[in-house]
Amino acid sequence: MQVKENKQLCLISLGCSKNLVDSEVMLGKLYNYTLTNDVKSADVILINTCGFIESAKQESIQTILNAAKDKKEGAILIASGCLSERYKDEIKELIPEVDIFTGVGDYDKIDIMIAKKQNQFSEQVFLSEHYNARIITGSSVHAYVKISEGCNQKCSFCAIPSFKGKLQSRELDSILKEVEDLALKGYKDMTFIAQDSSSFLYDKGQKDGLIQLIRAIDKQQALKSARILYLYPSSTTLELIGAIESSPIFQNYFDMPIQHISDSMLKKMRRNSSQAHHLKLLNAMKQVKESFIRSTIIVGHPEENEGEFEELSAFLDEFRFDRLNIFAFSAEENTHAYSLEKVPKKTINARIKALNKIALKHQNHSFKALLNKPIKALVENKEGEYFYKARDLRWVPEVDGEILINDSELTTPLKPGHYTIMPSAFKDNILLAKVLSPF
């Protein structure tokens, strides 16, 4: 029998969904605390930080300082995750307000660290396994599943390998066991994540690891829907695209950050790919029926000239991604691009503004294409007093958009789960829809 401590825990998980999985592992170890969103009343404040780019680092630092200012006397403030790991040699002196620091290797030991009130930094990066009990947050029907940690790519701008290490893939059986366990608890929709998902099992000498995973999930039949994030162009193949297309469970969702399209820029970025390869993959994705394609672009990488930017801009306008994330180059220590001559900030800002217009135009077109036709969706929960919150099955939670269903049009309350719905209008990134039937 699990006995609740008479203590409150405030968890703040910053950054990506991969960080969220690690936060949920820590919640699993701290199950006997009562969760609160109020920093001021918490006995333990746990901030799982992000240290990917400058803006994320600043957000993490500010969140820590705000918590330190607001915490009650005697409360324990903990900083875990990427920022702590990346700057572990200096962070203790830089932010003395923190009581416990830990990096990316000891999420499953957080309860011991709190009990002993001590820092801990293991050499090995933690990789969540099926036996690590997690408390899933934010949904009763959707969960993220991490399939690997680390990355073997050598992108000029990315510091992740310097603190997350080389690629280490989970065993396929461990993933299947976790999926089965979560599905039995009602999580019938999952998103599979990694730093480089398409390289899954490369470290074990297998080039078709992600295809194996897709087929094993299909055979298992524990889920009703799933999708994959973070395909890397050089390890993505036509066969992988075909496996996703033919899967009855995995949605035709393709998230592949290309970063650029110019061959000269791809070489400068050390992306180990080419425009021709990008186009081959992207055109194959677009040929898939009802495909949804998301990508990420970096603007202002050192030595990006006007011609290369214009080539990128023209391509993005022609290809029409459903969703597009656009980031300004962030100079990060321990990367090849850090010491290269920078593009002026004014130029970067102007380029981002131009690309954002293109991205918004095609995003709106993607939303409009859903109007007045039945789509498969996942109803998550009640949003306020009058609406249920839902999303297109191809979408990732909190990322690709939101669908609201007016409860006044319903004869009975909706349970979280899978439904066919009909969108009728949209504004910004929100669709309004009515329910047709469950499935």
UniProtKB/Swiss-Prot annotation:
Cellular compartments annotated: Cytoplasm
Function noted in UniProt: Catalyzes the methylthiolation of an aspartic acid residue of ribosomal protein uS12.
Domain Radical SAM core: from-to ranges: 137-368
The gene coding this protein: rimO
PROSITE patterns to which the protein is assigned, alphabetical: MTTASE_N, MTTASE_RADICAL, RADICAL_SAM
Xref: Pfam families: Radical_SAM, UPF0004
PANTHER family on file: RIBOSOMAL PROTEIN S12 METHYLTHIOTRANSFERASE RIMO, RIBOSOMAL PROTEIN US12 METHYLTHIOTRANSFERASE RIMO
GO BP of this protein: tRNA modification
Domain MTTase N-terminal as annotated: residue spans: 7-119
Binding site residues for [4Fe-4S] cluster 1: 16, 50, 82
Residues binding [4Fe-4S] cluster 2, per UniProt: 151, 155, 158
InterPro entries: Elp3/MiaA/NifB-like_rSAM, Methylthiotransferase, Methylthiotransferase_CS, Methylthiotransferase_N, Methylthiotransferase_N_sf, Ribosomal_uS12_MeSTrfase_RimO, rSAM, rSAM_horseshoe
Keywords, sorted A to Z: 4Fe-4S, Cytoplasm, Iron, Iron-sulfur, Metal-binding, S-adenosyl-L-methionine, Transferase
Protein name: Ribosomal protein uS12 methylthiotransferase RimO
Any one GO molecular-function label of the UniProt entry: protein methylthiotransferase activity
Cofactor binding mode and count: Binds 2 [4Fe-4S] clusters. One cluster is coordinated with 3 cysteines and an exchangeable S-adenosyl-L-methionine.
